[in-house]
Swiss-Prot record:
Heterotetramer; dimer of two heterodimers formed by alpha and beta subunits. Its cofactor is Mg(2+). The gene is farsa-a. It catalyses: tRNA(Phe) + L-phenylalanine + ATP = L-phenylalanyl-tRNA(Phe) + AMP + diphosphate + H(+). Signal peptide: none annotated. This is Phenylalanine--tRNA ligase alpha subunit A. The lineage of its organism: Eukaryota, Metazoa, Chordata, Craniata, Vertebrata. It comes from Xenopus laevis.
Length: 498
């Protein structure tokens, strides 16, 4: 039945009923149409002005689930188990092959309709205990299906609901009455005044739909920030609130010297091979270095110094010259600390950076080959591990991450070192979110920093905290070709509680 026909039937019912109203559910049943079709007709008539008045009403109704409908036709699981059993009984293994047996067996046992003989010949065997049964579950479901849910007591309804055979749903309907401009004839209201109407004068005979000045209108199309950019902005704001200065991170390409050697990472370290690092083919080698500093780094690697034995190997300038895609932004920190050491008088500093790094890693749910690293560095006299833990707790607390664990770790350029773990509610496990430590004297003293100056350093990825904040379980749903653009549109503004 077309919507216009439903609208006409609705108006005619109101006309015939005098001052009485019409219930949309009753009208749908009377006309044999879907209730939503009647609702559409009501809303269409409302748009025509004061022809009708419609009051929305809500009521509770019991409906059968898909399993409940099946049981209403075929019988309950326990009844079907009983009916499957012959007088001589049936092997339990054979009965349990039926799809209804798992639930039906336990229910039939509870009702004492059947018994299990575990000592029977050939294996456990099930027998009938009674000659006949009454399938009350099927009867109650059929009553509810016929709209007679009130004939089933509340206890039984709740039991059926517990078995997921029925659901209590809220049904919304309309009580429709005549409006001040009621008429049984439907006149289409125009929405636009066209040049043709003006030229012909036909506009005088037209009815125009009134403007709804309260309507919000269509939301304008605009750009949407990716969750990573939102969280990055919050990270940056937190660093600035804590008094940090942002470091320049425009060099994606670094020499192995600044990325590894300056950080007292030996040239035989496995992180420096092709399985973990992306090497450049052209230009393959860097040529410009602060030579005096380079010689001091070479010496501390190959011979030791500053109270350290070093690594005792033949340090190669060729290995240090190799250009790579930086594996961490700590290379930027090394450059900044070297510039700090060149100053005439030492001044305490707090630096931070947020930018991309690259590692030749296997992709999985929590790892990418290209990701963002957040770096924090504090340089001052007399700093300790306690200072580091305090700064980290304050930093992560500002991120809204309070479930933290610190685990002792090893890093070539920090001692002592700690890994930082946070609990991921989505993955239901502790996830590493950062690494930290006090920079080693073998790193700081060759730069020329005073001996009593200590440097705290920590780094974490941007992606994992973003996953935690937005409840994303797989990093490939956040970055890459599998990203759902609707997620980008719908994701709320990130506010990390201080």
């Amino acid at each position: 039945m077309a919507d216009n026909s439903v609208s006409e039937q609705l108006l005619q019912r109101l006309q015939d009923g005098g001052s009485k109203g019409v219930d949309s559910l009753e009208l749908a049943a009377l006309l044999g149409v879907e209730h939503q079709q009647v609702v559409g007709a009501v809303k269409s008539l409302q748009c025509l002005g004061e022809i009708i008045q419609a009051e929305q009403r809500s009521s509770k109704k019991w409906e059968l689930s898909s399993e409940g409908e099946e049981i209403g036709r075929e019988g309950s699981h326990e009844a079907r188990v009983f009916q499957t059993l012959p007088k001589e009984g049936l092997l339990q293994a054979q009965l349990m092959k039926q799809p209804f047996s798992k639930v039906g067996f336990s229910k039939a046992m509870s009702n004492k309709w059947i018994r299990l003989d575990k000592a029977a010949e050939g294996g456990p065997r099930i027998y009938r205990v009674v000659d006949s049964i009454e399938d009350t579950v099927k009867e109650k479901l059929q009553l509810i299906l016929k709209g007679r849910a009130d004939d089933v007591n509340e206890k039984d309804r709740n039991e059926l609901k517990k078995r997921k055979l029925v659901n209590e749903v809220t049904v919304k309907s309309y009580w429709v009455t005549k409006g001040s401009g009621f008429s049984t004839s439907i006149t289409k209201q125009e929405t636009d005044l066209t040049p043709e109407m003006i030229a012909s004068g036909s506009w005088r005979e037209k009815q125009f739909k009134g403007y709804n000045f309260d309507a919000l209108g269509v939301m304008p199309e605009c750009g949407h920030l990716h969750p990573l950019l939102k969280v990055r902005t919050q990270f940056r704001q937190i660093f600035l609130e804590m008094g940090f200065t942002e470091m320049p991170t425009n060099n994606f390409i670094e020499s192995s010297f600044w990325n590894f050697d300056a950080l007292f990472q030996p040239q035989q370290h496995p992180a420096r091979d092709q399985h973990d690092t992306f090497f450049l083919q052209d230009p393959a080698l860097a040529t410009e270095f602060p030579m005096e500093y380079l010689e001091r780094v070479k010496k501390v690697h190959s011979e030791g110094g500053y109270g350290s034995q070093g690594y005792k190997y033949d340090w190669s300038i060729h290995e240090a010259q190799k250009n790579i895609l930086r594996t961490h932004t700590t290379a930027v920190s090394a450059r900044m600390l070297y510039k700090l050491a060149l100053q005439k008088d030492f001044t305490p500093v707090k630096y931070f950076s947020i930018d991309r790094v690259f590692r030749n890693e296997t992709l999985d749910a929590t790892h990418l080959a290209e990701f963002h690293q957040i770096e924090g560095v504090v340089a001052d006299r007399g700093l300790t591990l306690g200072n580091l833990m305090g700064v980290l707790k304050e930093f992560f607390h500002k991120l809204g991450i309070t479930k933290l664990r610190f685990k002792p770790a090893y890093n070539p350029y920090t001692e002592p070192s700690m890994e930082v773990f946070s609990y991921h509610e989505g993955l239901k496990k502790w996830v590493e979110v950062g690494n930290s430590g006090l920079f080693r004297p073998e790193l700081l003293l060759p730069m020329g920093l005073p001996e009593d100056v200590n440097v705290l350093g920590w780094g974490l990825s941007l992606e994992r905290p973003t996953m935690i904040r937005y409840g994303i379980k797989n990093i490939r749903e956040l970055v890459g070709h599998k990203v759902n653009l609707q997620m980008v549109y719908d994701s709320p503004i990130c506010r990390l509680d201080a």
